[in-house]
Amino acid sequence: MAEKNERAIKVVAENRKARFNYAIDDTIEVGIALTGTEVKSIRNGKTTIAESYADARGSEIWLINANIPEYLQANRFNHEPKRPRKLLLHRKQINKLIGAVEREGMTLIPLKLYFNERGRAKLQLALAKGKKLHDKRETEKKRDWSREKGRLLRSRG
């Protein structure tokens, strides 16, 4: 039997500031509804999701403010770079996320945009709560101390 052409997960965009600015409670993998030129542009790797967030509009969840630049080889049928994009979830997942956002004051933050093994664009969405300034400082102190410990152990060993 012929061997399958296996693809690894390819992370295209990552929101690195999210783990510093938010206390992440839960993560979920969601699909994203895209046009053809958007998929091609994402594959080029110029996408940014750092300033983006997800919001409930009606009974659907949308990705707001994600920047997927226009595909350079496309002609007049190109897409709008910062348009809202629909996220694809099951109804129970949507209800759970909407409930957490409305009742508990949580926020939906995208962490990663990637292509899975089947070549589909997926988004790792986090249910998070914003950190206060003193929490951010504490996180930074812990990170600095762990780096310093590593340096001390390496210099001794």
Curated annotation (Swiss-Prot):
Pfam families: SmpB. Residues 135-151 have a biased composition (Basic and acidic residues). One of its GO terms (cellular component) is cytosol. Keywords: Cytoplasm, RNA-binding. It comes from the Bacteria. The keyword Oxidoreductase does not apply. It is found in: Cytoplasm. GO terms for biological process: trans-translation. InterPro entries: SmpB, SsrA-bd_prot. GO terms for molecular function: RNA binding. Residues 132-157 are annotated as: Disordered. The keyword RNA-binding applies. CDD domains: SmpB. Required for rescue of stalled ribosomes mediated by trans-translation. Binds to transfer-messenger RNA (tmRNA), required for stable association of tmRNA with ribosomes. tmRNA and SmpB together mimic tRNA shape, replacing the anticodon stem-loop with SmpB. tmRNA is encoded by the ssrA gene; the 2 termini fold to resemble tRNA(Ala) and it encodes a 'tag peptide', a short internal open reading frame. During trans-translation Ala-aminoacylated tmRNA acts like a tRNA, entering the A-site of stalled ribosomes, displacing the stalled mRNA. Belongs to the SmpB family. This is SsrA-binding protein.
